[in-house]
Amino acid sequence: MSKYRERIYQHYVNARDSPLAPASISRLTSRAPYLNKVIRGHFPSDRSARIIDLGCGHGAVVHFAQTAGYQNVMGVDRSPAQVKEAQRLGIAGVTEGDLSETLESLSDESVDLIVTFDVIEHFTKDELMPFVDEVNRVLRKGGKWIIHTPNGESPFAGRMRFGDFTHEQAFTRTSIAQLLIASGFSLVTCYEDAPIPHGVKSTVRWILWKIFRGGLRVFFAAETGSLDDCIFSQNLLAVAVK
């Protein structure tokens, strides 16, 4: 690991304006609408499917997957501080480990779903290629890789791309599809991180998002002559099928 990464990751939890982990498990509810939507829409229907969340942080995805009834889900994170936070929150199945080494330890076609939330942007291009190949190797035929990552197509792309000193790159729906299809995945679909209405405040945000998004589409059409349905959110969700 490079020296700059080693220094930053040692203080990844405490060297921030806001904490990465909530004070208690009940405080994870703010992420529930989005993560539950991802789980309902993209996780396997089989609750015994083998699921691995690589770069799981304090285990939010693991927690909501377990709450949804998934029995064989685990998370791995290289940050001891993050794993300690998961343990403090009482989230089972989160362990410390190197992500690439974890993949290398797995048998071919032994996993149904790989999840990486806010992970692949930390790799250089040369580092990412073997990581992608390993994910493809361990996934079963028809298995999925769910990727959440900064969206380089967003008008505010710089906020996410440069908001973390360890970020090496950002992706667009076309560049991430280019990478994954060239690496053996059969289908890649990208989704916008739009607000999810679940109360008054979030509904207002959703309405405003629709209005401003429409304006951005018009702006895009003025330049290109196309009403292409771009992804404008600061992050995107990509789902790749092997």
Please name every model-derived segment.
Residues M1-E109, L113-F117, D126-D133, Y191-P195, ...:
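Conserved N-terminal segment of class I S-adenosyl-L-methionine
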Residues L139-W145:
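Short glycine-dipeptide loop
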Residues E121-F123:
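A short His-aromatic
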Residues I146, C190-K242:
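A C-terminal cap/extension of S-adenosyl-L-methionine-dependent methyltransferases
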Residues I147-Q169:
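Short, glycine-/aromatic-enriched active-site segment of Class I SAM-dependent methyltransferases
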Residues I91-G93, G163-T166, W206-W209:
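Short, hinge-like loop/turn segments at secondary-structure boundaries
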